[in-house]
Amino acid sequence: EWALLNFFVNEHLGDGYELILPPHMLNYECGYVAGQFPKFVEEDYWIANPTSADRKFMLPTAETALVNLHRDEVLTLDELPRKYIAYTPCYRREAGSYRAEERGMIRGHQFNKVEMVQYTTPEGSDAAFAEMVGKAERLVQELGLHYRLSKLAAGDCSFSMARTYDIEVWIPSMGIYKEVSSASNARDYQARRGNMKYRGEDGKLHFVNTLNASGLATSRVMPAIVEQYQNADGSITVPEVLRPYMGIDVIR
């Protein structure tokens, strides 16, 4: 897993992203700006009572912290786009996920993930989204995993997101594809909640666009590697891109 995380982070840094190590405990306002509250307030772990004045919740995804970095700020055109990544554990209650296919590493209350977030102008938003989807796809391709790219229907997208694509890897033992990355464009939804603007060439203030994508979640990538790379004798061939980090070619 550490080899995967190092591979992901190094790939993103090489593409011009800035690494952030955000806090794991956030206040209610962070969840509100990200578009997770009040609708999903019951899905997170709370340090204090959700209705108390000093309420804090555990980070469900690094996106929640990263989209609050420029809250109540005015950026310049020269500062856009801003590209951030963060590696964090993610903490989720996952209430109601009791199916057999959701056991073990596939869906846990704590898992590790590298997250990408961009702040862009509205004009650069679509290009940024295509870039982020392409980056997540490239990571899966470089690992040599069988996968598919799915565009979510409007009814399946979060209410705060204008567009979402999922990247899913094949899990042979389950006979299904499971999501390892979700890329979304919030347009100016989060920016309006967080009062995040930039000054345009016309001298006026405009809301930025925010985008996020997993790059990637390790808890589902690892089972996919184990199963797709397993040999007849039970050994596991290490994907070529991970060998410099692990120092071995085969796990026996």
Give the residues covered by each predicted segment:
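TRNA-recognition modules of translation machinery and tRNA-sensing kinases, especially anticodon-binding
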Residues: 1-252
